[in-house]
Amino acid sequence: MADQPVQVNKLKTKITKGDMFKTFVFENFQQASFNFERIHALAFCVDMIPTIKRVYSKKEDQVAALKRHLVFFNTTPAMCGPIVGVTMALEEGRAAGEPIDDGTINSFKVGLMGPLAGVGDPLMWGTLRPILAALGASLALQGSWLGPILFFVAFNAVRLSLKWYGLQLGFSRGLALVKDMSGNLLQKITEGATVLGLFIMGILVTKWTTINVPLVVSKTTVNGKTTVTTLQNILDQFCPGLLALGWTLLCMYLLRKKVSPILLIFALFGVGIVGYWLGILK
């Protein structure tokens, strides 16, 4: 079964199902050879080994192909599947005698790695990971052992799905994938991920950020029962979570002004301790 050729647009290729699976496994070590000179270049080269061995019979052709993929490469690891798939199709076409040179192959890699990273970074690191981490942490805070399991399983399910189906899509569509990606699809995905991420983070601000100002504004006694109205009561009636939102926006503003996150953390500790000592915060 593993040695059966993959069907691509009803045409047989030299790439087998076993080659495809090996490539998928290698994809999961994208960060293993990370370096600041060529980022993921060596890992991408390893990803291409099953294909290169399959389509090139001569040793010198295999060596040249491997060297071809040692150039700079950088994209979101979860999104490398389509790029690897397209490159596999290009390498097979070159081995079959198609007029595909080194520049063409590298141009496709460079042309895809930027846009896919533009989608993958906000999708994986800016949206999916914070949301799943927040859900897992919420369960963990309640004493449930399902919290870390939920995060690990859900995150990796999405990551592996993107790698596997992205690899299949890239290989099966080949050059047509590039045309699809050059439209508004990436922009729409990015915008959707951004809106969803902002929506979820807005919910988490009110859930996790607690600011209580217990300053007494008034005391009223009716039928022997005293009602104390604090500044926090008034703010909650006006807009629940207003202080938490304002504090969060202030921190975001300071971060954009290049204020050190470490400095902000210590400032938060200081404001909390001093505010509690003065009776302003609770």
Swiss-Prot record:
Major site of localization recorded for this protein: membrane
Where does the UniProt annotation locate this protein? Cell membrane
Q: Which domain of life is it from?
A: Bacteria
What is the recorded membrane topology of this protein? Multi-pass membrane protein
InterPro entries the record matches: GatZ_KbaZ_carbometab (IPR050303), PTS_IID_man (IPR004704)
Q: Where is the PTS EIID domain?
A: 13-281
Q: Where are the transmembrane segments?
A: 135-155, 197-217, 234-254, 261-281
Looking up Pfam families in the UniProt record yields: EIID-AGA (PF03613)
Q: What cellular-component terms does GO give this entry?
A: plasma membrane
The induction field says:
Induced by L-sorbose and repressed by D-glucose.
A GO term (biological process) for this protein?
phosphoenolpyruvate-dependent sugar phosphotransferase system
Describe the task this protein carries out: The phosphoenolpyruvate-dependent sugar phosphotransferase system (PTS), a major carbohydrate active transport system, catalyzes the phosphorylation of incoming sugar substrates concomitant with their translocation across the cell membrane. The enzyme II SorABCD PTS system is involved in L-sorbose transport.
Q: What is recorded about the domains? A: The EIID domain, with its homologous EIIC domain, forms the PTS system translocation channel and contains part of its specific substrate-binding site.
Name the record gives this protein: PTS system sorbose-specific EIID component
